[in-house]
């Protein structure tokens, strides 16, 4: 026996079903609204976090790259030895280097510099160009090494250290081995570092340093060259003099892979070569580092010029904010007094003798550990 709902019961059931559907619809809408609101709030939070991160990055970048306002002043560039070096290749004097580093490391403390900049601004008032015949040296002052000796680096103050390192690297054609540069400045002192920088710039002005590199090959490999026309052979002696010989007859020359002879042939009919010497010019940074390397006693060289010491210093600086280094200010060798070739009465002549011959020979000597540091300057550990 089946039971059939009456009309009233059916209406009541339909109303209840409709109410249930409405409640479900409302619940679903509320859920969706809550989800959307949560999503929007999360998106806003993410955007805010991203903005905060970008702002923090900008602040960190500004902190990492300290800038001096006056060094970007047009008037300062007129009298800056560094700017004259960049624009015109003029090698600064030692006193000019003292002045440049004193000014950038003593921002807003040199009253004479402020007065000079004010005077230049008056001359350049109304955006009128300064006369071409203007001589900046008329109003420029210079600082001495006594002023530089008063500058003391605080290991916890990265601002001054980075300013000095960047200025040194700028003079050395944007040298990229900045960690090694920092180690040198803190170890041998700012004054000695500036003196070596001046020495390097003088060497570059006079033509630079060229090294002869012989590629590695098997010890039994020989070089045989047969020529039917003119053959020119240039041999580099130990004293860096050149001996040139010419032979128009047919000849055959044989040399081991360690030979320092550079042979140039025209119209060769039969040539078998393996390891020919390659002449390369050292970078200004390489000359600077090599000069310091030569003046450090052998027992202390590894404290600066080695991969292990470089990693050690960088890791210490990362953990503690600074690294430990030996104080080598009073341990540097003096080549001038020890190698004056018996001419002690005239220091200028002996210095010129050392510049042109002694260091040219010493800088060409191969030091594998040192060359690794120079060649690896593009590596991450050097930046």
UniProtKB/Swiss-Prot annotation:
Q: Where is the composition biased (Low complexity)?
A: 28-63, 242-275
**Quick one: a GO biological-process term for this protein?**
snRNA export from nucleus
- Between which residues do disulfide bridges form? none
- What are the boundaries of the region Disordered? 27-66, 242-281
Q: Which PANTHER family match?
A: CYTOSOLIC RESINIFERATOXIN BINDING PROTEIN RBP-26, PHOSPHORYLATED ADAPTER RNA EXPORT PROTEIN
| Record-given protein name | Uncharacterized protein DDB_G0292662
Source organism per UniProt: Dictyostelium discoideum
């Amino acid at each position: 026996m089946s039971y059939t709902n009456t009309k009233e019961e059916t209406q009541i059931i339909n109303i209840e079903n409709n109410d249930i559907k409405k409640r479900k619809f409302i619940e679903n809408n509320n859920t969706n609204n809550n989800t959307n609101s949560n999503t929007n709030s999360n998106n806003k939070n993410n955007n805010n976090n991203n903005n905060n991160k970008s702002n923090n990055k900008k602040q960190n970048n500004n902190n990492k790259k300290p800038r001096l306002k006056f060094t970007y002043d047009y008037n300062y560039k007129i009298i800056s030895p560094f700017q004259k070096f960049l624009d015109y290749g003029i090698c600064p004097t030692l006193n000019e280097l003292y002045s440049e580093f004193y000014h950038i490391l003593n921002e807003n403390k040199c009253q004479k510099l402020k007065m000079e900049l004010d005077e230049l601004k008056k001359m350049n008032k109304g955006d009128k160009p300064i006369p071409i015949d203007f001589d900046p040296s008329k109003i420029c002052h210079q600082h001495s090494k006594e002023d530089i000796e008063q500058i003391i680096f605080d290991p916890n103050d990265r601002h001054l250290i980075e300013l000095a390192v960047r200025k040194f690297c700028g003079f050395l054609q944007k040298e990229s081995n900045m960690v090694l540069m920092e180690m040198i400045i803190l170890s041998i002192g700012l004054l000695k570092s500036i003196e070596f920088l001046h020495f390097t710039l003088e060497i570059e002005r006079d033509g630079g340093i060229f090294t002869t590199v012989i590629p590695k090959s098997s010890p039994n490999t020989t070089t045989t060259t047969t020529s039917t026309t003119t053959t020119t052979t240039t041999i580099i002696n130990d004293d860096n003099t050149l001996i040139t010989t010419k032979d128009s007859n047919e000849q055959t020359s044989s040399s081991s892979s360690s030979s320092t002879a550079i042979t140039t042939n025209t119209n060769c009919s039969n040539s078998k070569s393996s390891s020919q010497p390659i002449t390369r010019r050292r970078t200004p940074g390489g000359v600077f580092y090599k000069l310091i390397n030569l003046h450090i006693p052998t027992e202390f060289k590894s404290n600066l010029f080695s991969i292990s010491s470089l990693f050690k210093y960088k890791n210490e600086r990362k953990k503690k904010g600074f690294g430990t280094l030996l104080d080598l200010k009073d341990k540097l060798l003096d080549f001038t007094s020890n190698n004056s070739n018996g001419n002690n009465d005239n220091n200028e002549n002996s210095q010129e003798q050392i510049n042109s011959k002694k260091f040219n020979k010493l800088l060409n000597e191969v030091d594998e550990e040192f060359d690794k540091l120079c060649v690896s300057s593009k590596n991450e550990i050097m930046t």
